[in-house]
Amino acid sequence: MAIHLYKTSTPSTRNGAVDSQVKSNPRNNLIYGQHRCGKGRNARGIITAGHRGGGHKRLYRKIDFRRNKKNIEGRIVTIEYDPNRNAYICLIHYGDGEKRYILHPRGAIIGDSIVSGTEVSIKMGNALRLGNALPLTDMPLGTAIHNIEITLGKGGQLARAAGAVAKLIAKEGKSATLKLPSGEVRLISKNCSATFGQVGNVGVNQKSLGRAGSKCWLGKRPVVRGVVMNPVDHPHGGGEGRAPIGRKNPTTPWGYPALGRRSRKRNKYSDSLILRRRTK
């Protein structure tokens, strides 16, 4: 991804750093209108997820996470921007005439060929075939992968964000051991499929929106500290001037501990599959 800096004509362009290479050119048979109701509110209109609201209208691009087009070679035709995710997507033209969107693998360029299925090679000569999808049982150890299935046939659910990559570190019995982007080490069935390579748009965290209006277009509302609120709005609020929070430890707006509290459900079915907890 190439970061583009504007000439300093206004404060917003002076501080902004955007990607100017990838554009959006969606295909009509692969896009759908979506009604983004709520925007952080529940059915009663109460805010349940903060800092959400507004934003530009979006068309949903149908992404092929299942990669169930078996043993039919496809070719990358375009690399496009998707407003619904921070990763890029690429349009694939398959040999039988069908067209699908997939997540753009880092390093893949227009004209590259991809294929999914069993016994699919991840190399062609000395070149890596980024974007090929195959079961974990057919991948060598140490392979960098993304778009990983948890349930066989359900489609990829892990490592789908921009720059995300997991690593296959072991295979034993019916399970494969993966190290996920969060640092978590867990077991997954060897029959589940994954895509070879890393998700593209690695430098997404280097972008700078430059002004509040650009953040508003993304549907993100301002973040307000609890210490500057009133007591009715937050436990940290109130006081005269720059007052401390008045508690031993920081809390959420609903009074629960804010730092270090585990949010994962207890006795979840997948606890036995996690060998090491996430580190970030």
Swiss-Prot record:
One Pfam match, by short name? Ribosomal_L2_C
Which Gene Ontology terms of cellular component type are present? chloroplast; mitochondrial large ribosomal subunit
> Which keywords label this protein?
Chloroplast, Plastid, Ribonucleoprotein, Ribosomal protein
Q: What is this protein called?
A: Large ribosomal subunit protein uL2cz/uL2cy
Q: Which organism is it from?
A: Platanus occidentalis (Sycamore)
What family is this protein classified in?
Belongs to the universal ribosomal protein uL2 family.
Key word Ribonucleoprotein present: yes
Q: Quick one: a GO biological-process term for this protein?
A: mitochondrial translation
Q: Which NCBIfam families match?
A: rplB_bact
InterPro entries according to UniProt? NA-bd_OB-fold, Rib_uL2_dom2, Ribosomal_uL2, Ribosomal_uL2_bac/org-type, Ribosomal_uL2_C, Ribosomal_uL2_CS, Ribosomal_uL2_dom3, Ribosomal_uL2_RNA-bd_dom
Cellular localisation: Plastid, Chloroplast
Oligomeric state and partners? Answer: Part of the 50S ribosomal subunit.
Any one GO molecular function term: structural constituent of ribosome
Q: What is its main location?
A: plastid
Q: Does the keyword Secreted apply?
A: no
Question: What are the boundaries of the region Disordered?
Answer: 1-25, 231-280
